Amino acid sequence: MALLQISEPGLSAAPHQRRLAAGIDLGTTNSLVATVRSGQAETLPDHQGRYLLPSVVNYHASGLTVGYDARLNAAQDPANTISSVKRMMGRSLADIQNRYPHLPYQLQASENGLPMIQTAGGLLNPIRVSADILKALAARATEALAGELDGVVITVPAYFDDAQRQGTKDAARLAGLHVLRLLNEPTAAAIAYGLDSGQEGVIAVYDLGGGTFDISILRLSRGVFEVLATGGDSALGGDDFDHLLADYLREQAGFSDRSDNRLQRELLDAAIAAKIALSDAEAAHVEVGGWQGDITRSQFNDLIAPLVKRTLMACRRALKDAGVEAQEVLEVVMVGGSTRVPLVRERVGEFFGRTPLTSIDPDKVVAIGAAIQADILVGNKPDSELLLLDVIPLSLGLETMGGLVEKVIPRNTTIPVARAQEFTTFKDGQTAMSIHVMQGERELVQDCRSLARFALRGIPALPAGGAHIRVTFQVDADGLLSVTAMEKSTGVEASIQVKPSYGLTDGEIATMIKDSMSYAEQDIQARMLAEQKVEAARVLESLTSALAADAALLSAAERQAIDAAAEQVRAAAAGDDADAIKEAIKNIDTQTQEFAARRMDQSVRIALKGQSVDEV
């Protein structure tokens, strides 16, 4: 079901037309773009066959360069070469200066306190820089696909807050892209491995990139990925491996001059090449600055072991925060180029007690997952493969007294959406309310689909109808329904989350809609009967309470007439004639009008007892 393409299940506005979509991994160090072609997700290379695009932009008076060309200018033009801009996204100038005090850029605050970077191309904010990276990726995709993109899915870290996510969306819009969805990076990686349709349980995503380390603990339940905990180290990554190895090579070669920037660059390049070689070989030969020698994998492992241990400490903290044990983790997904290092894979496997998933290139796995999601959201996947909600296909509501369904969000409402309704207690002194979340178009609970149940407790003990409970239904962009019930006077609340689309095929949805039409008249009659029965029960409940408190206000004849009317209501409510119940309720209302007036007068006299006219 395509985003914003509202149609009946099983129908498509243009079934022959394939829309162009891409998944974008907008990374701190490198970015990638991927798409689905011929049913396979693939990352798209540049003209030199390089899949990674360094997340670097160099601004100069005549324009800008992005990627590898921009990175070459970092040494000689640091003030105008912006890298790792993702770290600045959604942050204030003060926050950035506190976190990253050694940035080579000239920063200043805008009127609203947001950071602006002074460059040869003018004052720029992080959103604009990110937009320029996105433009370069989009250009690569449009050239490869020979057409403009209909939409993109962009990945973001699971810990990104609303401001950071909004900044990412704004950058995409500035780049001229239609954002289908922002997708959490660990979720994208899990989707790439097909874990979204596999065994339910806990999944760990270990993401060791060039400059940062992130660990995410997810729980997959009924088609929903829930982020249980995140952690990591924003100052630890594969770059640290490179610098340790470069320092080791400097020591082995006897180079003492640390002011030689050119030599430092050569050492770093040699270290990177050796690290890559040691992923496949037990030893690597190094030549740098006139020195040559060998380094073994064992030596390299000794250098980086403390850093790998730090990542595992972060994993341990994340598991503790999530409230799960390492042995409960079903799968471990490896993300980031630095997870190619054999020691990393070995130690992670030992820590979690299982072999990590590494069959997909760890540099590409997030982009591939985003591409798969984009292909679905843009409308290229048949509904039978995966149903994602962009309009609500079936109404969502609650069970009310009498087995009725009160619709809160009607079908074909576009998402995200939030709706609320108020309900009251049915009985005197009621202190709890059962919330039964329903899905479907029929009028009765028995004909709709049960999604979830939960209870709201701690309601003040008041007369029937005295407590007011506000029930809010909220469906996010991923089709995840959150239902929250709150008692208004106390603020006590309870909530639950559920994926309405989980386990439903398109055919089942169509059948449910068809049935609602076929049985419409019958359902309305059944609803009217049920409503009258509920009203009858309410009237009798109220009458019982009133008689228990104030029967002395009635004469024997009046009491007999009321009892007879009540019995008439009970008899009618036991039958299936809604009109008969309605007439019986009307009759008892007539019989009790004088009783109600006397009770009101008595209450007023009690309330005013001992007060003078002036006081009143």
From Swiss-Prot:
Keywords: ATP-binding, Chaperone, Nucleotide-binding. Signal peptide: none annotated. It comes from the Bacteria. Pfam families: HSP70. GO terms for biological process: iron-sulfur cluster assembly. The keyword ATP-binding applies. GO terms for molecular function: ATP binding; ATP hydrolysis activity; ATP-dependent protein folding chaperone; unfolded protein binding. Transmembrane segments: none annotated. InterPro entries: ATPase_NBD, Heat_shock_70_CS, HscA_NBD, HSP70_C_sf, HSP70_peptide-bd_sf, Hsp_70_fam, ISC_FeS_clus_asmbl_HscA. Belongs to the heat shock protein 70 family. Chaperone involved in the maturation of iron-sulfur cluster-containing proteins. Has a low intrinsic ATPase activity which is markedly stimulated by HscB. Involved in the maturation of IscU. This is Chaperone protein HscA. It comes from Klebsiella pneumoniae subsp. pneumoniae (strain ATCC 700721 / MGH 78578). The lineage of its organism: Bacteria, Pseudomonadati, Pseudomonadota, Gammaproteobacteria, Enterobacterales. The gene is hscA.
